[in-house]
Regions:
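Conserved alpha-helical substructure of the radical SAM core
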Residues: 2-68, 75-78, 90-91
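Short glycine-enriched, charge-decorated loop/helix-capping segments at active-site entrances
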Residues: 9-14, 109-115, 180-185
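Amphipathic, non-transmembrane alpha-helical secondary structure
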Residues: 20-28, 47-55, 78-85, 121, ...
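Conserved C-terminal portion of the radical SAM core fold
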Residues: 31-38, 65-67, 93-94, 118-183, ...
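Conserved radical SAM core fold
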Residues: 43-45, 72-76, 95-113, 141-143, ...
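Short aromatic-enriched loop/helix-cap "lid" or pocket-rim segments at secondary-structure transitions
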Residues: 50, 80-81, 148, 177-180, ...
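Short, hinge-like loop/turn segments at secondary-structure boundaries
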Residues: 84-87, 113-115, 153-155, 182-185, ...
Length: 236
């Protein structure tokens, strides 16, 4: 339901619904005492069919924590949100949800879907107020880099249960590669905005972590907040 200009895993026409069942079986087989990431596409497009997936993990791999990447729009459905909230009390689960602007037109432009901002904001409010753990993600681009601090300020004032704000550097993969010239902004061009965003997060009492940036591209103040990303090609 989103077509982000920088989607790292562009949608395919093939039906891969079977992967949800296979993923549940694989997670249960591993029995991992750690975190497993769930992404897509958009995993919450399964709607209520996603709930049995969570139930299966709770029953068969209770020590496994889940981190689910989603655009958050499904949480605008309060009935779905309440069902997920019940399950979130039985398993360690966090939802990584992006908000790319405090302005509807900018967010909708970047995700390629009119009305996405309003639905995502409603979803974030519903999820947070229901006690669901949220990691709020922001990717700076040409369209939004000037408002990084405003986005963080907006998040701190409007939403609840935000466990972390993640500032993530744009990756040249998927649709970002073909749209690179119209969305990428040199990191050095918005160093002051990164610093201001850090200040805004501090005022809000929300931890901020930075991903996908070489330290030499960040203001020194941000170094202690930079995480070492998992892929070797990001560490240059």
């Amino acid at each position: 339901n989103n077509l982000c200009l920088f989607c790292s895993q562009p949608p395919k026409k093939s039906n891969d619904d079977w992967l949800l069942t296979q993923s549940a079986l694989a997670i249960a087989s591993f029995g991992l005492d750690g975190v497993v990431g769930v992404s897509g596409g958009e995993p919450l497009l399964y709607g209520d069919d996603f709930l049995p997936f969570i139930d299966f993990i709770i029953e068969n791999s209770p020590d496994t924590a889940l981190h689910v990447l989603t655009n958050g729009r499904k949480f605008a459905d309060i009935n779905f949100t309440q069902e997920m909230a019940k399950r979130s009390k039985k398993i360690k689960i966090t939802f990584g949800i992006p908000l790319y602007s405090s302005r509807p037109l900018v967010h909708d432009h970047l995700v390629g879907s009119d009305g996405a901002f309003n639905e995502t904001v409603k979803g974030l409010i519903n999820a947070g107020n229901s006690g669901i753990n949220i990691e709020l993600r922001v990717i700076p681009t040409l369209a939004n880099y000037t408002e990084l601090d405003d986005i963080v300020e907006f998040v701190g004032r409007v939403f609840s249960n935000i466990n972390q704000i993640s500032l993530m550097g744009l990756e040249s993969i998927g649709w970002a590669r073909k749209n690179w010239s119209t969305i990428f902004i040199e990191h050095s061009s918005y160093s002051e905005k990164i610093t201001s965003a850090i200040d805004a997060a501090h005022r809000s009492g929300i931890p901020l972590t930075i991903f996908n940036y070489p330290l030499c591209h960040l203001p020194e103040r941000a170094w202690e907040l930079a995480a070492q990303s998992i892929s070797d090609w990001k560490n240059y």
